Amino acid sequence: MLEKVQGYIIKIVNHNDNSKILTLYTNKLGKITVAANIPEKLSNGNMGIYDLGNAVNVVLYRKTEDEMYKISEISLLKQYTNMHFDYEKLCILNYVLYAINQNFEENFGDLTFMNFLKLYMRFINETKTEIKKMIFLFDYYFMLINGQIEILPYLNELEATFLEELSTQIVLKKELFDFITPNLIKEMNKFKKNKFKFLDINKELFYN
């Protein structure tokens, strides 16, 4: 049984020298755990293909529905290189991947969120933006798709316009994004702590 999917690598566990257990967030199967056999030597075109956050094309196979998917073929769709060389971007990347892994059940998928994630990852990779604003943006949208939040009464008009565009068209516009206020971020952080198991943005992110 073969399945072709696109997805993001959100977690990696080294099983042994030549195999890994990957958690992927995919367009067709949602969040899934798969096994990957790693060649001893990767070709130059595949160097870094198993880095966290990579967007990949994958062909999966399994003999029965009870069996874990295994990777038959994998190719790199998008590698967000800047995130691995900028500390703040790396913090955001790890935060996002941790949040998806912790709060999405196995096989949960949402194509609207997948489209948002694609734009969001590109935005982080290419833009120098205040880290708290980027975390706020992810938190808001994450809660929105999970039905945890309907309206924020303390939004000003510009913020409301930005979030309306975000939720209906999945549009990231820097000129609107920059109007997100520190007070709104503070309130969202309070709300967030009562709803989700996110980590603080600090060095502990890399060692837990």
Can you say where each PLM-predicted feature lies in the sequence?
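Non-catalytic alpha-helical scaffolds and adjoining flexible linkers that form interface surfaces
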Residues: 1-19, 25-29, 34-208
